[in-house]
Regions:
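Short gly/ser/thr-rich secondary-structure transition/capping motifs
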Residues: 19-27, 45-48, 79, 133-136, ...
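Pre-active-site segment of Zn-dependent metallo-hydrolases
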Residues: 1-41, 52-55, 107, 137-147
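Cap/insert and terminal regions of metallo-dependent hydrolase folds
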Residues: 136-223
Length: 230
């Protein structure tokens, strides 16, 4: 999301209908954010991942990677010319990317919420990274952890949900479940406190991790924070 604070209405049928999205301004100018960026990787096309401002601001020659042909056509319709679908072994330089199972809600919500994807990044000299994306904790995530054995995991765990159908991504309790299923991995928890239908705060994740005894490997970046040493 690159739009200014409050430029979009709240997500309907959810909590905090008095709040407009995004809830905060960007921590630094868009120009700084895009400096040095040569690839955009999209898990899906919901407004809290890529908004109209992003379509307008990102240079049209930017290289995009998306989950499927439908998303490719949508992104191209905004004037972008270099849009590719992630396959079984898509490469960016020496980094290999492949899709991982993902489900954006329970049996009620997964259809209206639409398709989404996780991604796994591998490199001969780097740790395997699994970006779970917008998914609930379910059997597919367990399979991903067993299949790819990631050493670094990024989790969207803001507990975003709707009055009918419940949550569409993980929450703080699910962070503990992932940590138990991947006992040697570092976890980076994101997608927090940014939009109206978030229900989990950084402090909630921190307290849950502390009680579970996993705070030493659960990291909760602040807005604008860059993590380099994984």
């Amino acid at each position: 999301m690159l739009g200014k604070k409050g430029c979009m209405p709240p997500f309907p049928f959810s909590r905090n209908q008095h709040l407009r999205n995004p809830l905060h301004e960007l921590p630094f100018p868009v120009e700084k954010m895009l400096k040095g960026v040569d690839v955009v990787l999209l898990t899906h096309l919901h407004d809290d991942h890529i908004d109209e401002a992003a379509y307008e601001i990102i240079p049209k020659d930017m290289r995009f990677f998306v989950q499927d042909e439908n998303d490719r056509q949508v992104v191209m319709s905004h004037g972008f010319n270099h849009v590719e679908v992630v396959g079984d072994n898509t490469r960016i330089g020496e980094v290999s990317i492949q899709k991982a199972e993902s489900q954006h809600g329970n049996f009620i919500m997964k259809y209206p919420a639409g398709h989404t994807a996780g991604y796994v990044f591998t490199h001969p000299q780097e740790k395997t990274l699994y970006h779970a994306g917008d998914t609930i904790w379910y059997a597919g995530v367990k399979r991903n952890l067993k299949r790819f054995r990631p050493e670094v995991i990024t989790l969207n765990a803001g507990g975003n949900g709707f009055r009918l159908g419940g949550r569409v991504i993980m929450n703080d309790e699910d962070v503990v479940k992932v940590a138990a299923a991947a006992p040697d991995a570092k976890l980076f928890v994101t997608h927090l406190e940014g939009v109206n239908h978030n229900s989990v705060t950084r402090e909630m994740v921190r307290k849950r991790a502390e009680v579970a005894g996993i705070l030493d490997r659960v990291f909760i970046p602040e807005d604008g924070e860059t993590v380099e040493d994984l």
